[in-house]
């Protein structure tokens, strides 16, 4: 089992897609998180109970922008959300790992440094880039303000922390084609 991690907007999904193109099984915990947050799901009901109707859209789905503003403004609220989501995400990830076929599987875990899942990995692959590159990508990709982008980056493990758990590193500072 290979844990693939990196900071937000570092290029984890792009690198995971390269492996997927080579028929390597990929389990993406961000996708699992989206799946478990379906309308009327137990996780979404617990989030609504904990954070209130302000984080729920008119159609009953999670208002990701409202949730993001809350959790990146206050550490305690981010911890509350993680306590709701992380056990569910990990349970589903381990179920998918057990069902995967092949000599190895890549498990994409953005917050691997902060997660107990790192202990289960045989190797850890960190997708790395400079913080300024992350900021630029995050602002362009998600239309974030520089202030909001910095809050998001600052809420995650530091680059040095991520690199400290790496068995292997992909420098994703340059072009996508170079990494492929």
Q: Where do the model's predicted regions map?
A:
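Well-ordered beta-strand positions
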Residues: 25, 31, 123, 167-168
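An amphipathic alpha-helix signature
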Residues: 44, 48, 131-136, 146, ...
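ATP-dependent small-molecule kinase phosphotransfer cores
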Residues: 31-103
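Short, acidic/turn-prone active-site loops that include or flank metal/cofactor-
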Residues: 31-34, 129-132, 154, 176
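Residue-level signal for inorganic ion chemistry
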Residues: 11, 30, 81, 106, ...
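Walker A (P-loop) phosphate-binding motif
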Residues: 1-24, 29-31
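ATP-dependent NMP and nucleoside kinases share a basic, alpha-helical "lid"
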Residues: 91-98, 104-140
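Small-molecule kinase domains that catalyze NTP-dependent phosphoryl transfer to phosphate-bearing small molecules
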Residues: 101, 119-120, 140-180
